[in-house]
Amino acid sequence: MKHLISIFAAAVMFVACTSDVQVVKNTLRAPAYPLVTIDPFTSAWSAADRLFDAPVTHWTGAEHNLIGILTVDGVPYRFLGKESPRNRFIARASDQTGWPASYMLSRPSGSWMERDYDDSSWIFGEGAFGSPSRRPMIHTDWEGPQVWVRREVQLDKSFAGRDMYLYLTANEYATVYVNGIAVVDDTKKYSGEYIRLADDVTASLVSGKNVIAAVVTNPSGSAQFDVALVEKLPIQMRQEMTAEQLYADVQPMQTRYGFTCGPVELSVSFLAPLFLDDLDLVSRPVNYISYEVSSLDGVKHDVKISLEASPAWAVNFYGNEETLSQTFSSNGLLYLKASSVDQNILGKKGDDDRINWGSFYLVAEESDTQALVSEEGDMAFVRDLGSSRKAEGKFMIGYDDLYSVQYFGENLRPYWNRTGDVTIESQFE
């Protein structure tokens, strides 16, 4: 714990002031504000002028849910992040695990797109389909010119009236049917896009057998076809108000925000202690979120602060990958932890990929703090700051990636744990 306090205090003092340099507030409007900058795997940004106007995102654009709420005298004020609809994959897209399919490489006879069509003579394989260079996402090699695919989806209930989507990757183009009804029929390329299903298509999704059928064309070049069925879950509206943002200020090792939340002022700093003369500290997989609450009217106020995160931090494709969330305590600290179930270490490569191995951590001081984990794996801390005119504290965000780099086929440990005998808990203490 003393190690933690010394690093945090040194970083705060350094970025606040030095003996001969006065820190000047940065008034430039950033295209995106850095919040968490542990490494390219674990980074989070705000692409809004006000911190509460948009969801927090990874640098690739994928949402990394992070929501902060300050409750003053029973009134909640959201100062960080924003809720957004979530996708629940009823039939998963291809990842480390493929999906069963029947396919033909020549034009089949009859109404091959219909639900009750007999495809027993077709070839059995696994999706996704495409060029071998796209493995491990590809499970059946195919490079063209055409492939006919049928994917059976077993449902345990009707989805009539639900907000349903087709998730589609098709390079070059495809005609796609759901239970015999055309959903996509054009020459557009689709790269992980969501296509809303019309009411008649959604009404056709019944308990039992359903079929997604497609003919995919790839005249030349690299090929890929992946399809899934998705339900978009509505936002669970909460009654909190938003804070009033006073400023946003980006400095070399921190991004600072100021807010008013009713009768109190809230200052929040996202801090990354990247002292370049200390490689162990630079590689340390921990960032801080510090906060300070001050009464504006000189009166004591009852204040609670909460920080929420989703398992999206620990997976490449949130909603499509299974996750596990848990909580535990150690040496005066309270931990929230999220991990993918598959744990395929350094098993993927590409331009739009995120880490899906190792574990994400949200950490707080144990005193006066409650840790919550929902059935969906969402995690939250609620800390009671009591009744006072001034209070302060911090949360920590970290990631244990186990292995960071693959070098000529060999997985190498992160520098902070290069000997393999350092625990992630010690990095928070």
Regions found by a protein language model. Name each.
Residues K2-F8:
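Sec-dependent signal peptide recognition
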Residues V15-A16:
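C-terminal motif of bacterial Sec signal peptides marking the signal peptidase cleavage site
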Residues S19-P34, S43-A44, D49, S84-E114, ...:
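Acidic/polar, glycine-enriched structural segments that form the non-catalytic walls/loops
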Residues W122, P145, V153-G180, I212-A214:
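Aromatic-lined ligand-binding clefts that engage carbohydrates, nucleic acids, or primary amines
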Residues R134, W142-Q146, Q236-R284, E365-G377:
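Extended, loop-rich substrate-binding clefts of extracytoplasmic carbohydrate-active enzymes
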Residues D141-D156, I195-D199, Q254-Y257, M379:
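Short beta-strands within extracellular/lumenal beta-sheet-rich domains
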Residues Q154, G192-T217:
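Short, surface-exposed tryptophan/glycine-enriched loops
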Residues N218-L229:
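Edge beta-strands of jelly-roll/beta-sandwich modules across compartments, strongly enriched
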